[in-house]
Amino acid sequence: MYVTVEPGVTWLELYETLKPLGLRTPFWGPFSGKVSTVGGSMSFHALSHGTNNAVSADSLLSLQVVLGNGDVIETGSQGKGSQTSRFFRYYGPDIGGFFLGDSGALGIKTRISLKLKKYPEGFAACSFGFPDFEHLFQAMRDVAKLGVVSDNHGLDPRKQKTAIMEMENTNP
């Protein structure tokens, strides 16, 4: 299953369209929120909020791109001459990767096809504390192995505090 969108579609618009159908994309959207566009996420190789499906490119099946000379190309299994549907990104050499994280410098994305998966039957959030990073990492690894969690976050308060102090010292 896949969905094809124009690059100006926001993650919120896509979410609201797909949810009534019981579907979603593996990548939920970047840190900048639901108002971010799908095209922007691909152009800046956006990261999401957790450990699974955390990179926008992981949901990509194909791109339609207009090159600087005006040529229009299709990547993935929908590439030129292919009579197949958009089912697989890595059809031959993955030239789609050239246009991920390029900030639009290598071409203008005009159509983006993304994988779809079933929307989860349930949703819950919880928070835990750990005595140190090693225990946090072990717990995250064990949960990820179960395959039942879509996102798994972890923060080390000491590292966060250090990062904030460094930012304050370099940006007074």
Placement of each model-derived feature along the sequence:
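FAD-binding subdomain of flavoenzyme oxidoreductases
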Residues: 4-7, 11-145
